[in-house]
């Protein structure tokens, strides 16, 4: 899937007035491209408001990041759960109206989550780096900054807000971009979770090598529909190479109960990332425990 970056609007100055001329390809073709274009605008604005040097200064005073992968491997229940703090999504709209990230994070920690994922995208998920800061101040679990990261600046934002890991989405990055951004992330002490959606993307990541944490997203980012068969198909197709590279495999999206967890664990997923299913629970802590243990009170630990 090709994702075009937002085309520049050349400006023309007439007398003392300056006009921007819309580019011929000024309309995004699908929701993912729309998100990427909006993210470019967000980052431009953020750079002007908070210079990179300011972020570097903030990071200098922070403790070293927590070990995200170790937390997943040490989970008491298998597969390990990365529980997501998410208010809304483009496909579902507002998922939790009474959204309180502090209460949710505490409930996840009490419920047995190994790590947390925090949405920091404002325009489409109603998240923000301020939410990440709140969660960081609340729990000691490793935190994943989940966003559409296109630039090193965003990695500095994530680290300054307290993230221990960052999501890099293969669908919106070239091989060169992924390699560069992962080096920046590593220099900041951030673990990288590389997200793929199809065989072509997973092939690219494995060809590059050096990525011990890979997530298979069961959601089609052009339609936002989910299908657990995505994890099943890709994990089987690339089983040998994933094992050779020592990859910890995460299954993301479309997971709603213990049967779903068993299904992806059976094909090699050592961790799952779950958001919507938990955000819709009136009792998030109880919902997480139910998800991990199931109706019979057993799990494949």
From Swiss-Prot:
Alphabetized UniProt keyword annotations: Amino-acid biosynthesis, Aromatic amino acid biosynthesis, Decarboxylase, Lyase, Tryptophan biosynthesis
Gene Ontology MF term list: indole-3-glycerol-phosphate synthase activity; phosphoribosylanthranilate isomerase activity
Keyword Amino-acid biosynthesis: yes
Reaction(s) the record says it catalyses: 1-(2-carboxyphenylamino)-1-deoxy-D-ribulose 5-phosphate + H(+) = (1S,2R)-1-C-(indol-3-yl)glycerol 3-phosphate + CO2 + H2O
Pathway linked to the protein: Amino-acid biosynthesis; L-tryptophan biosynthesis; L-tryptophan from chorismate: step 4/5
Pfam families: IGPS
EC numbers, comma separated: 4.1.1.48
Any one of the GO BP annotations: L-tryptophan biosynthetic process
Coiled-coil region: none
Keyword Plastid: no
Class in the EC hierarchy, top level: lyase
CDD domains on file: IGPS
Family statement drawn from the similarity comment of this UniProt entry: Belongs to the TrpC family.
Protein name as catalogued: Indole-3-glycerol phosphate synthase
Recorded name of the encoding gene: trpC
């Amino acid at each position: 899937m090709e994702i075009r970056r937002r085309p520049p609007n050349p400006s023309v100055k007439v007398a003392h007035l300056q006009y921007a001329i819309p580019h011929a390809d000024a309309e995004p073709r699908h929701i993912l491209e729309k998100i990427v274009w909006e993210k470019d605008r967000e980052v431009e604005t953020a750079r002007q408001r908070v210079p990179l040097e300011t972020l570097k200064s903030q990071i200098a005073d922070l403790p070293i990041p927590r070990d995200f992968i170790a937390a997943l491997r040490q989970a008491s229940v298998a597969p390990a759960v990365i529980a997501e703090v998410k208010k809304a999504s483009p496909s579902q709209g507002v998922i939790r109206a009474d959204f309180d990230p502090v209460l949710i994070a505490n409930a996840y920690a009490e419920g047995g989550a190994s790590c947390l994922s925090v949405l920091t995208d404002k325009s489409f998920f109603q998240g923000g780096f301020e939410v990440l800061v709140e969660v960081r101040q609340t729990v000691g679990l490793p935190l994943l900054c989940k966003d559409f990261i296109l630039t090193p600046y965003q990695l500095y934002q994530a680290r300054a807000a307290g993230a221990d890991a960052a999501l890099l989405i293969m669908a919106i990055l070239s091989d060169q971009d992924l390699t560069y951004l992962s080096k920046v992330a590593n220099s900041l002490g951030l673990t990288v979770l590389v997200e793929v959606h199809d065989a072509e993307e997973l092939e690219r990541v494995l060809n590059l090598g050096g990525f011990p944490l890979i997530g298979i997203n069961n959601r089609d980012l052009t339609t936002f529909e989910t299908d657990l068969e995505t994890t099943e198909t890709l994990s089987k197709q690339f089983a040998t190479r994933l094992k050779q590279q020592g990859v910890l495999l995460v299954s993301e999206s479309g997971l709603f109960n213990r049967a779903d967890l068993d299904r992806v664990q059976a094909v090699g997923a050592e961790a799952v990332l779950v958001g919507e299913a938990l955000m819709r629970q009136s009792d998030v802590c109880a919902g997480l425990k139910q998800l991990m243990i199931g109706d019979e009170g057993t799990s494949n630990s």
